[in-house]
């Protein structure tokens, strides 16, 4: 469970903590809290720990976009993300047409604030941003979110989250073609 209404101050604090440790705005729809995601990750975490995986949970205000970006070059074996996903076929750039929603995204999704005015990320992680990460060494990414396997189709294949994570170096993906309720 992520807090999509996380305050800007909390987001800035979390962004600074992540930095020390290692956009879309086309409508006014706000992202609602997904209570099932908290149950999902707190159920999976002990299972992974019992299988000798190191587990880091980032929920509520800690679930900022920078947490995923901080995994770049970390050779994390498995990444499981339970949140909102989106696909907007009207985007002019295929890699901007889909993404994942992180804590605090409602502050930017529905407001007139510009990304350039912020010293931290906006909580909306696009496929384009993901494609610039180095996730080599990541065996599996699980995206428990709506429509994560959708993308724009061109002569070069599908442009979306699947291409972004593969370009970033992820070996395998578990994604959905439908809305997750």
Enumerate the language-model features and the residues they cover.
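Catalytic cores of enzymes
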Residues: 1-181
């Amino acid at each position: 469970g992520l807090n999509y209404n996380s305050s800007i101050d909390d987001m800035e604090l979390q962004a600074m903590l992540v930095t020390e440790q290692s956009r879309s705005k086309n409508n006014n729809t706000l992202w609602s809290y997904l209570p099932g995601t908290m149950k999902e990750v707190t159920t999976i975490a002990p299972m992974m720990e019992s299988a000798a995986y190191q587990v880091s949970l980032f929920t509520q205000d800690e679930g900022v976009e920078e947490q995923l970006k901080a995994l770049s070059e970390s050779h994390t074996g498995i990444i499981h993300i339970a949140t909102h996903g989106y696909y907007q076929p009207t985007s002019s750039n295929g890699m901007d047409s889909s993404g994942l929603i992180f804590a605090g995204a409602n502050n930017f999704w529905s407001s007139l604030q510009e990304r350039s005015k912020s010293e931290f990320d906006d909580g909306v992680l696009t496929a384009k941003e993901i494609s610039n990460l180095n996730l080599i060494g990541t065996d599996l990414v699980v995206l428990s979110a709506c429509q994560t396997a959708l993308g724009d189709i061109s002569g070069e294949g599908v442009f979306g989250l699947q291409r972004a994570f593969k370009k970033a170096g992820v070996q395998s993906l578990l994604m959905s073609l439908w809305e997750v309720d």
